[in-house]
Amino acid sequence: MAAAGSLCQTAWRVRGWLAAGLCALLAGCASVPDAPSGTAEGAFSRGGRFAITMTESSGEQQAVQGGFTWRDDGRRYQLDLTNPLGSTEARVEGRPGHATLTKADGTVLQADTPDALVEEALGSPVPVSGLRDWLRGRVADDAPAGKLQSDAQGRPLSFEQDGWQARLSRYDDQGPGLLVLQRTEPGRRIVVRLAVSQP
């Protein structure tokens, strides 16, 4: 059992920047709009499991999985990623004009915008937005969406937006319980899977 725990921890250390990259990527999707001070509009929290796979054109593949908890009061947000043992591996905290990513080893990345944080963490620009809406079962209105398919209640099931192909399913009152996001970039393909288990 101890050996298995050590193996998991080692794998997470090896893949730490991939996890941090996912954290920054999700934060980049969660740009917080300027809102009047004290407003609770848009407040929500979601949690569950995540898995991210990055496949290089050479066929080399990196993958990491764990848990996520997202707390958002409409102006500030906090996103935690945990390893399979439940330890926090990365945390992103953000507000308009500032975003910070802190890894478990104390490494800190800071940027004016979540998108800049994504570029610093992943090493390439990923101008994404919308996950904040997607987690609620909405297509973001700040970018055009293509190939939109909806269910009988008008909730989006699949669409393309900001370079991502998104599939949403297993809806509850708060939004989709499963999000599968795929993005193809020069030299690599990224697949992110979020399974929500907490409202």
Curated annotation (Swiss-Prot):
How is the protein disposed in the membrane?
Lipid-anchor
Q: Which family does it belong to?
A: Belongs to the LolB family.
Protein name from the UniProt record:
Outer-membrane lipoprotein LolB
- Record GO biological process: lipoprotein localization to outer membrane; protein transport
Main location class: membrane
* Keywords associated with the record: Cell outer membrane, Chaperone, Lipoprotein, Membrane, Palmitate, Protein transport, Signal, Transport
Tell me how this protein assembles: Monomer.
Localization recorded for this chain is: Cell outer membrane
Q: Which SUPFAM superfamilies match?
A: Prokaryotic lipoproteins and lipoprotein localization factors
Biological role = Plays a critical role in the incorporation of lipoproteins in the outer membrane after they are released by the LolA protein.
Tell me the gene name. Answer: lolB
Query: In the UniProt record, does the keyword Signal occur?
Result: yes
Q: Which Pfam families match?
A: LolB (PF03550)
List the N-palmitoyl cysteine lipid attachment residues: C29
Q: Where does the record place the S-diacylglycerol cysteine lipid attachment?
A: C29
Residues spanning the signal sequence: 1-28
